[in-house]
Amino acid sequence: MSRLEQRFAELKAEGRSALVTFVTAGDPGYDASLQILKGLPAAGADVIELGMPFTDPMADGVAIQLATLRALEAGQTLVKTLQMVREFRVDNQTTPIVLMGYYNPIHRFGVDTFVTQAKEAGVDGLIIVDLPPEHDAELATPAQAAGIDFIRLTTPTTDDARLPRVLERSSGFVYYVSVAGVTGAGSATTEHVTEAIARLRRHTDLPISVGFGIRTPEQAANIARLADGVVVGSALVDKIAQAKSADQAVTDVLSLCSALAEGVRGARR
């Protein structure tokens, strides 16, 4: 059983949803980013999505675009992102880490080298936003062969004809993007999310995590009553942007994570 399967199974047995947190690797700098990464589990993160900075993050809103820029300006590379995961794994062998980003940097790095090093570093899953199922052979197939889950995005515009193709080779969990558009956009209504999850459950037994537009503990709790996972990214990244120092960034991100975790954990009581 993979770390992702294990974590979602444990939480299902506990009767609660997972808090899935997104931060960009290397934002606001390597050391502070590593502190955040290492601090997230104790602050209540059940699964961590770690963004791989790329110069053209087309699916991301302003907050994550700026985070990517900060990380790149601080010298973050794919090699350093994998090193961060290695350093995280020294102290934590249980919290799943999913790398999220775009195909171009992986292609340039070399797919086989990337998959080998990602597995060795302790990466559990990949979300590659610009690689559709038609291109499975390029990365999804070798990644899954190495034991790395390949997580697909589904959106309100993924219709019933397309959905089986998207979900066919998915593993780990399904990431439902509740609002069409870029990350950090407005949030969806509870009714919309309820309907969307019911539709997805007709097509897959995988855990369903819902993200995009969730910013507060109250919003997180609302989604946690419906979904297997609640994804929060832009709200955490905004804390880094607003911080006056790297130390403040670490403190503020982990404080918000704790508040979100309280919302998620109390949602079904």
Curated annotation (Swiss-Prot):
Catalytic activity, as annotated: (1S,2R)-1-C-(indol-3-yl)glycerol 3-phosphate + L-serine = D-glyceraldehyde 3-phosphate + L-tryptophan + H2O
SUPFAM superfamilies in the cross-refs: Ribulose-phoshate binding barrel
Superkingdom in the source lineage: Bacteria
Pfam families with a match to the protein in the record: Trp_syntA
Its EC number(s): 4.2.1.20
PROSITE patterns, A to Z: TRP_SYNTHASE_ALPHA
Enzyme class, first EC level, given as a word: lyase
Active-site residues (renumbered): E49, D60
InterPro entries in the cross-refs: Aldolase_TIM, RibuloseP-bd_barrel, Trp_synthase_alpha_AS, Trp_synthase_suA
Pathway(s) where this gene product acts: Amino-acid biosynthesis; L-tryptophan biosynthesis; L-tryptophan from chorismate: step 5/5
rRNA-binding found in the keyword field: no
MF GO annotations: tryptophan synthase activity
GO cellular component: a single term: cytosol
Keyword terms: Amino-acid biosynthesis, Aromatic amino acid biosynthesis, Lyase, Tryptophan biosynthesis
UniProt function note: The alpha subunit is responsible for the aldol cleavage of indoleglycerol phosphate to indole and glyceraldehyde 3-phosphate.
NCBIfam families recorded: trpA
Subunit structure: Tetramer of two alpha and two beta chains.
Similarity field: Belongs to the TrpA family.
Protein name, UniProt field: Tryptophan synthase alpha chain
Taxonomic source organism: Pseudomonas putida (strain ATCC 47054 / DSM 6125 / CFBP 8728 / NCIMB 11950 / KT2440)
Gene name in the database record: trpA
